[in-house]
Each structure stands twice: as C-alpha cells, then as structure tokens.
Amino acid sequence: IFNKYIKDDYQLIADMMKEIDADAICMNELDNNTNRTRHVYQLKHFASLMGSWDFEYGAAMPYDGGEYGEGVTTRKKAVNKFSVALPKGVGAEPRVLVVMEMEDYVICTSHLDHVSSEAQLEQVELITKTMKERYGDSGKPVFLGGDMNATPSSETGKLLQKDWEILTITGFGTFPSDNPSKCIDYIMQLKGTPKCEVVGSQILRWFKSGDVTKASDHLPVMLDI
C-alpha cells in the first residue's frame, strides 16, 4: 500500500484517515523490513503517525529481505490480537488473516488470492471457521474488511455472503483507484453476531489531504456504524 506511486506517503495516508476520523483501519499489502522500503516496519510507523494507535501485523510470506502481509490498526487498545495463516492452495501466494478483538467488537482483515478462485474459496472457508469458532458466541459484532479480489456476485462473493453480510456499498468500483471499475473491497459483518446500525458507507474518491490515486491503487471503503 505504501510507496506504490510516491515515496514516503505514510503521512499522506495518515492525514487522509484522520480527515475521515477513522477509529479502525484494515490495511493490505504491507511490507515489514524489506529492502524496497528501506527496512521500515510500515504498520508500526503508520500507527505512530495516527497517534500511537494499537496494531496487529500478520506476515503472509517472506519478501525482499523482510516480510509482506496485512494489518489492522485501531484508535483504542485491543484486548486480544493474533494472525492465522491461510492456505495457499493452487493460488499465487500465501495469505493471512489478521484479527484485533476490542472491548466491544472484533475486526479482522485479509487479502484473498488474486489468481485462483479455488484458492479464494479455501481461504474464505478458514476465515469463516476461525471467526465463528472464536467469536460466534462472544456477544460482540464481528467485522471483516479487505481486498477480496472478487466481486460480491462472484463464486467467492457468494460463499462469503452465506456467513457474512456486506455492510458497505457495492454499486461502485473500488479498483483501480484512477478508474474504478470493479468492487472488490468491502466490509462485512459475521451473521449471528449482534446487529449494528449502519449510519453510512462510502467509497472515498476525494480528500482535502491529497490525491487518493497517488496513495493507493485501491479506493478506501468507509463504514460508519
């Protein structure tokens, strides 16, 4: 996510997230200690720019002298946090699920395989199994957000919606950010967990802080509950 189009865009993205007054952020395609990013622990650095936020990073695979993975960062401190390796299967790369349990909700993120729908389905099954077993009876709403690399109407999207309700708008594209034509990023809630009132949802294309197309190749998706 960071440094894809412009060098050292951490502050730009932090300013954008502060602009929308975010409380929790799911982040995909993070580097940790890689050569290409000059050995920065990207999520830790970003969380510090947000004001010493709590965070959890999960490494999906070794990459370029360091690691590559996903993460969640939150304004409040988590009561529990962990990551779970997801099956690569016939997909292109290993993937990971990252979870942060807060006092009153649970939020997790993943980035499904970008090549194989078969691999995506295996990854979805383990994500759902993990979150149901750990939090299905927790009395807390459970949210999953990230790059699913699949539209809601795809086979992967349909499998997700058996157990997850999509809460964000899906009628507009999220990728690519400069000409969004596919909705492959969304935020969902695990069915059977306490219902939340959705105040609003947006796919964010314009910020006062800067050009979102220079910050990421995906548009950020916001959910207000």
Task: For every predicted segment, state its role.
Residues 1-48, 62-63:
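N-terminal, active-site-proximal structural segment of metallo-dependent hydrolase catalytic domains
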Residues 48-50, 64-81, 180-196, 225:
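Conserved beta strand-loop-helix elements of the APE1-like EEP
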Residues 85, 118, 122, 129-143, ...:
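Metal-dependent phosphoester-hydrolase catalytic domains
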